[in-house]
Amino acid sequence: MILSKEKINNYAAYLYIKVAYDEAHNKMAHTVYFTNFYRSSKPLFLDEEDPINPCFQTISMGGGYVSGEVYRSDFEVEANARCIITTQSSAKAYKAVDGKTSEQHTNITLGKNSILEYISDNVIVYEDGKFAQFNNFKMDSTATLIYTECFGPGWSPHGSAYQYEKMYLNTKIYYDNKLVLFDNLKFQPRKNDESAFGIMDGYHYCGTMIVINQEVVEEDVIKIRDLVKEKYPDMDMIFGVSRMDIPGLGLRVLANTYYHVEKINAVAHDYFRRKLFNKKPLILRKP
């Protein structure tokens, strides 16, 4: 449900997208509302095998998060509806002023038999930046979720990585109102050696993919591992794939470029589009 105007005013920018299935006309009806410099594209139809499946690109007109700004987005995919949501480009968090943290809050609700492919670009935190991201998913057990995220350090005049002050990623997934995933990543390189073994292992980018669907089984975990090793045997990265307690899995990648993270996530995404939807790989046509 869209926030009241009084609550919307608490945020520097707000974006709301709702997608519902119009059975009478066999199409996806949508509602989009935004304020200030947070935007969404009109629905794009990039899935050539599914011409009624809309794709929305979220757009930050301000160029990035300035110290202390708080953004919020609410996405609803109703029963039997489906859509793709992606960012237009990387999100950027700049130098914190007066110790203030920039924040992004995203709340996503998935109804019965709904499908959401939420493919977000990386978050880049620059020197002296402080950024926190909070993602809350509430999904029906019959819904399908494919979600990606990534973060990495921005350019520094000193030429070294890990110059940001804080990077915090908090993701919660509720499955039939039960908390089934709580991913809590907090990086403070001025307090801890983030490049150390057991944290980032010397890599700069950390990517995550979550896939939840009733048809995900243990064999898929093994298959993804084998496909990645087969396709990128010499890539400088490390990755892991684990099955969740519900029908789903998580993929995590550590690499030195976002390009490498994207490539690994694409292996899993392509595999599940074939298995779950009988579709070809998704081409988002972003530069």
UniProtKB/Swiss-Prot annotation:
The lineage of its organism: Bacteria, Bacillati, Mycoplasmatota, Mycoplasmoidales, Mycoplasmoidaceae. Keywords: Chaperone, Cytoplasm, Nickel insertion. Belongs to the UreD family. UreD, UreF and UreG form a complex that acts as a GTP-hydrolysis-dependent molecular chaperone, activating the urease apoprotein by helping to assemble the nickel containing metallocenter of UreC. The UreE protein probably delivers the nickel. It is found in: Cytoplasm. It comes from Ureaplasma urealyticum serovar 10 (strain ATCC 33699 / Western). The gene is ureD. GO terms for molecular function: nickel cation binding. GO terms for cellular component: cytoplasm. Required for maturation of urease via the functional incorporation of the urease nickel metallocenter. The keyword Transcription regulation does not apply. Pfam families: UreD. This is Urease accessory protein UreD.
